Structures are given as structure tokens and as C-alpha cells.
């Protein structure tokens, strides 16, 4: 059972090493500069508490980590959010996400947002190599079978274990079912 820590009450130290879950990066890099009013808008605490904690971690000299899979998950979330914003601003539009990708100006905006977010993540944290070989599947499958993690989070946890990283910054209560040592969160459902 992981130890749960409040990001508001934690003081990071130089030796700390944190893996940052994708949604935290999303709120830190993309949402921080936008007012999003879709059905899936971030909550105020997500936009305030996680960026504040990331800044505290960086100020302490502690290390932040991500992996290349964060890019695919983040790109999908940003595209979905931009699509939702487009649909809300254009209620007469009856397009799906694939058709949305064909709108040149919207595609450029999405790609610009993804590029900016990814550059920021790489500027602030270390990208861990991920080996997605067939021999890794059984351990990931075991994590999926014994926790409530989704496949991305199971891969992240497997990578953290491989790299000896025991701390994760996340809003996701599924990590409570995992073997990660320490969860850092602002989510009151977990605390």
C-alpha cells in the first residue's frame, strides 16, 4: 500500500526523484495558459496545486522524470481538449475528431500546443528510455491484473520500478491500488 502525501504539505528535498503523471503535465503545461470551459474542464485545485508543487520540486533541486509515452497520452488529451473547445465555440459544426484534424488552422493550433507542452516537459524533467519489448509484456500484464491501473499507468509504474523511482506526482486514485511507494497528490479522494 502506497504512502499518500499532500502536495500542499510536502517539502521536496534535493535527493527526491519524482515521476510525473501525464495529467499533471497537462495541467502544468497546457491548461495553465488557458481558460477551459468544456464538460471535462480541470478543477481549480488541479490548475493551482500541482503547478505549485512542480515549482517547489524544481526549486529544491529534486529531479522530475517522464517517458516518451507521456507524449502520446498528452498529445491525445490536448487534441481532445482542443476539439471540445472547437465544438463548444462552433455549435453548428457536426464533425468528428478525424475530420477536425483535417481543418488546417485547427491542426496547426493543436500541433503548436503539443509542441510547446512537450518542449516544456523536456526542459524541466528527464526523459527515461522505455524498452517496449515483448519480454516486458508479462510484467505489465501482471500490473494490469493486480491493480486498477490503465495500460499507460501500468507501463509508467513498470518503468519507475525498473529505474528505482519510488515517488509519483498524480491525481489518479488508481495508483492507490499499486505498489508504488509514495504518491504525491492534491486529490482529496486519495488524501
What are these model-derived regions, one by one?
Residues 1-17, 157-191:
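Acidic, PIN/NYN-like endoribonuclease modules and their adjacent C-terminal/linker elements
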Residues 2-3, 13, 111-167:
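Active-site neighborhoods of divalent-metal-dependent phosphate/nucleic-acid chemistry enzymes
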Residues 56, 69, 81-88, 99-133:
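Low-complexity, serine/threonine/proline-enriched polar segments
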Residues 72, 133-139, 189-191:
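A short acidic, often aromatic-flanked loop/helix-cap motif at beta-alpha or helix-coil junctions
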Amino acid at each position: 500500500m502506497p504512502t499518500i502525501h499532500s502536495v500542499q504539505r510536502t517539502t521536496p528535498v534535493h535527493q527526491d526523484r519524482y515521476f510525473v503523471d501525464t495529467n499533471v503535465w497537462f495541467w502544468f503545461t497546457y491548461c495553465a495558459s488557458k481558460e477551459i470551459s468544456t464538460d471535462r474542464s480541470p478543477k481549480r485545485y488541479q490548475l493551482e496545486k500541482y503547478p505549485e508543487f512542480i515549482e517547489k520540486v524544481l526549486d529544491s533541486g529534486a529531479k522530475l522524470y517522464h517517458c516518451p509515452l507521456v507524449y502520446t497520452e498528452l498529445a491525445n488529451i490536448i487534441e481532445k481538449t482542443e476539439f471540445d473547445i472547437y465544438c463548444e465555440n462552433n455549435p453548428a459544426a457536426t464533425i468528428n475528431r478525424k475530420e477536425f484534424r483535417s481543418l488546417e488552422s485547427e491542426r496547426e493550433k493543436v500541433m503548436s500546443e503539443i509542441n510547446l507542452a512537450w518542449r516544456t516537459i523536456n526542459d524541466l524533467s528527464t526523459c527515461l528510455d522505455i524498452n517496449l519489448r515483448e519480454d516486458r509484456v508479462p510484467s505489465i500484464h501482471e500490473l494490469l491484473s493486480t491493480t486498477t491501473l490503465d495500460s499507460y499507468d501500468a507501463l509508467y509504474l513498470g518503468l519507475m520500478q525498473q529505474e528505482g523511482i519510488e515517488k509519483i506526482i498524480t491525481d489518479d486514485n488508481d495508483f492507490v491500488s499499486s505498489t508504488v511507494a509514495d504518491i504525491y497528490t492534491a486529490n482529496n479522494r486519495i488524501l
